[in-house]
Each structure stands twice: as C-alpha cells, then as structure tokens.
Amino acid sequence: MILQISNAVDTDTVKSIVAGLDAGQFSDGKKTAGWAAKDVKNNQQLSGKKSEAATQVLLDRLQQNALVQSVMRPKQVARVTINRYQQGEYYGTHMDDSLMNGVRTDISFTLGLSPLSDFEGGELVIEDASGERSWRLGQGDILMYPSHYLHRVNPVTKGSRLAMIGWVQSLVKQPNYRELLFDIEQSLKAEFDANGKSENFDRLTKVFHNLLREWSDV
C-alpha cells in the first residue's frame, strides 16, 4: 500500500524544526548511500546533534498520528535522516537497502518539510509494473510505501526541498497483510462512529485482532 497523508505533522512544529536547522551541518549525501547508489545520489544530509534532536521531535509527532501508525504498525525504526535538495540536485533510480543497522526495512517514508512554494521539481517517483507515479509533498505531508519499490527524486529545478526520510520495520512483514489490516481497522472505526459498539463492530474487531495476532512478527 502506498498512502499519502496531508498534515501528518502540524505546520507549527515543522516550521519550528526548519527554523532551527543550521545550513552548515549539511554534508554530502553520498556518505550514506549504498555502493551502487553513490553514482546516482546528489543531495545533502543533515548531521550532528541538531539532526538527532529534530528527527526525534518529528518521529514523536508521527507516533501520535493514529492514521500513520495504522499504515506502518512500526516495530522498529531502522534509520531516519533529514535531507536537502537544492537547485540541480537529485537522487536517481535506486533500491533502498533491505537491512539498515541490522533492522529489516519494510516501509520507507518521506515527510515534507518545505512548503511547495519553496521549490519546483523534486518529485518523488515510484516505479512498478504498471509504470510510474509521482508526488510533490508539502510541508507536513507524508508518503509511506513498501521498501521493495524502485524509486527516485527528480532534479529540483528551483529553490530548495527539505524532507525527513526514514525506514521502518513493521510488526506485519507482508505489505498485502498490512493493507488488509488497515482497511479492516478503518472499517471498524467507521462502524463505531456510525452505530457505536454494535454487533458488526464486535465482529470486525474480532477479525482485526485475530489477524493481527496471526500475522504479527514480535
């Protein structure tokens, strides 16, 4: 499942984070690329204590977003970083590493930190058997997708694009199982909102928790 959520992190929090970033702490993104991806990676990454503090605040906000948690069902965060693409910078087609810091990567995500008015280009493009799909993420918007896709970031043609990217090991390894659980959970919540703790709500809750119990990797 590929899902975009608008305003996953509130604008005030994102603006505060961005205002505190020191341009001097950005370094060549090739340093963290895999051996093949180094040839196609042309961006910058934030390093140092400010990076750790900023990413932790943003992760905390994402953990408070019920819809984000329902999509990812995170078990462990493998890696997270803030990157920057300035005019002419890009990240060519590549595959994310299957393991990072000894953690399996099931889900990749990008959280936009720049308003769309701050840059042009910089689309995140995901490739699959049906072709390509692209996204431009605004400030606070998140895109979550299974890590098994080839993807790229198109060149920024104007301005500067800031984003936080991360990789997560999910409690539910299989992406089709995660999508089923997401659909069931949204359905049982809709049933509760409409009819309270009805018989249908109880049945859906039973199905949801028994499937989660069956499929969880704990």
Curated annotation (Swiss-Prot):
Biological process (GO), any one: DNA damage response
Residues annotated as domain Fe2OG dioxygenase: 76-170
SMART domains per UniProt: P4Hc
UniProtKB keywords: Dioxygenase, Iron, Metal-binding, Oxidoreductase, Vitamin C
A GO MF term: 2-oxoglutarate-dependent dioxygenase activity
Binding site for Fe cation: 94, 96, 151
Entries under PANTHER family matching the protein: PKHD-TYPE HYDROXYLASE YBIX (PTHR41536:SF1)
Record protein name field: PKHD-type hydroxylase IL0759
Native source species: Idiomarina loihiensis (strain ATCC BAA-735 / DSM 15497 / L2-TR)
